[in-house]
From Swiss-Prot:
Component of the GINS complex which is a heterotetramer of sld5, psf1, psf2 and psf3. It comes from Emericella nidulans (strain FGSC A4 / ATCC 38163 / CBS 112.46 / NRRL 194 / M139) (Aspergillus nidulans). It is found in: Nucleus. Residues 245-261 have a biased composition (Basic and acidic residues). Residues 262-272 have a biased composition (Acidic residues). The keyword Nucleus applies. This is DNA replication complex GINS protein psf2. Residues 93-128, 244-272 are annotated as: Disordered. The GINS complex plays an essential role in the initiation of DNA replication. Has a role in chromosome segregation.
């Protein structure tokens, strides 16, 4: 007997999609350019930095043919700042730290006075499209990244949990203080998971009008892991709400019948 397929995308499938994220490497050996489905990869010439898909970077790292430069957010200082936002900032006690802006959107500090509009891209045939993760450079290394913290706080990309876990497993020697990085990632995951669980409490309004949970800033793996739990809660609340609505309608019908009977008795007495 075959088990039913899980609803939605599974965690292994999410990790597979995260391997398409672009990361920065420093090649140790020369390698000719590659033509991939996601686009061409420039020839690898040491020590020139190159952005390649994560799966290719992990392959070259295992073969000791390249080193991976961690993205700015995967630094202990960046993760500590994000953890402070998640736990100490009153504006985010029941919300998640803001995600990085999409192409064409203003930065976090500019959103108060600039209109948020995404900038489209175009295919070679001229078709317009809007790029989304994993096809955005949210995990590439940047020069002078920490100087930018003074003007722009660090943010977690959409595939932060998957990318961080894979880099810690395969390229821990390329990260700054991997033990502390692993601990901060674990704390962030626990804090954000607790927010998701606590946010489900407001889903009791799903039985009535206007219920919902804001998921702005939630990562792909967090959505995949919480989908089954949240869906089960919503289904249960919907059934409870349906039974409550049925009971309310029955009470309303009984009250209407009693009023009709009382009025009928009154009319009978008046006729008598």
């Amino acid at each position: 007997m075959a088990f039913p397929l899980p609803r939605g995308i599974t965690p292994p499938e999410i990790s597979f999609l995260a391997e398409m994220e672009l990361v920065t490497i420093v090649p140790r050996q020369r390698l000719e350019g590659l033509e991939l489905l996601g686009g061409p990869v420039a020839p690898l010439i040491p020590p020139r930095r190159t952005n390649v898909p994560l799966w290719l970077a992990l392959l070259l790292k295992r073969q000791r043919r390249a080193n991976i430069l961690p993205p700015p957010w995967l630094h202990p200082e960046s993760l500590s700042l994000i953890l402070d936002i998640e736990t100490r900032d009153q504006a985010y006690q029941h919300a998640f730290s803001p995600p990085p802006p999409l192409p064409g959107q203003p930065s976090l500090r500019e959103r108060s006075y600039k209109k948020s509009t995404a900038r489209p891209r175009f295919t070679p045939e001229g078709t317009k499209y809007y790029a989304t993760p994993p096809f955005l450079p949210q995990n590439v290394a940047q020069d002078q990244a920490f100087d930018a913290f003074e003007s722009e706080p660090p943010t977690l990309p959409f595939h932060w949990l998957e990318v961080g876990t894979m880099l810690l497993d395969a390229a821990a020697d390329d990260l700054v203080d991997p033990d502390q990085t692993r601990r901060l990632l674990k704390e962030l995951r626990e804090v954000r998971s607790a927010k998701i669980r606590s946010g489900v409490e407001v889903l009791d309004d799903a039985a009535g009008p206007g219920g919902g949970v804001a998921l702005t800033g939630v990562g792909a793996m967090e959505i995949g892991e919480g989908r089954g739990f949240i869906s089960g809660v919503v289904d249960g609340l919907r059934r409870i709400g349906a039974s409550k609505e049925q009971a309310r309608r029955e009470q309303l019908a009984d009250a209407t019948n009693r009023e009709y009977d009382d009025m009928q008795d009154y009319n009978d007495e008046m006729e008598f």
